[in-house]
Amino acid sequence: AINDFKEFDYVFVDTMGHSHRNEEQRDNTKKLIDCIERHAESQCYLVLSATTKYKDLLRIVDNYKVIADYHLIFTKLDETYTLGNLLNLKLYTNASIAYVTCGQNVPEDIEVFDPQKTVKLLLGGKNN
């Protein structure tokens, strides 16, 4: 199947909401990532909701850390008033935050992560 995508610059693989608690799904995700990494240059992104409780986020990132090194993408920034989890998780995982999403219009609402903008919002500043 990988050969079908050789001519593409980017191929996105979505695990369709696999649960980090389901060992079989985690194993299948690891096999998929391992296969892709053997045949192509790749980057792995762990997509997390900014509205998820911190304790749950910790369990998710711990479960996926055994699968692959990853960058973080946070969704639903427009649906939360607290952004501290972004910083806390970045520090906990040492993974870079690559992108954030602020709405449901794709791709318009996907932004490259801007640390200065996020710190401003964390400190009570307004989003322009």
Question: In which residue ranges do the predicted regions lie?
Answer:
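Conserved beta-strand/loop subsegment of P-loop NTPase cores
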Residues: V13, E41-L48, K65-C102, P107
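Charged helix-capping and loop-helix junction motifs
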Residues: R26-L32, L58-D62
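Switch II (G3) loop of P-loop NTPases
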Residues: A1-N28, S49-A50
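Conserved phosphate-handling catalytic cores of large alpha/beta enzymes
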Residues: Q104-N128
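Short, function-defining helix-loop hinge/capping sites that tune catalysis or transport
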Residues: N22, L83-G84, E111
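Short, surface-exposed amphipathic charged segments that create phosphate/polyanion-binding patches used
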Residues: I2-K6, N88, E111-T118
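Conserved catalytic network of the ASCE P-loop NTPase/AAA+ motor domain
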Residues: N3-F8, I36-E41, Y64-I67
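Conserved Switch II/interswitch segment of TRAFAC-class P-loop GTPases
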Residues: H18-E23, R38-L57, T80
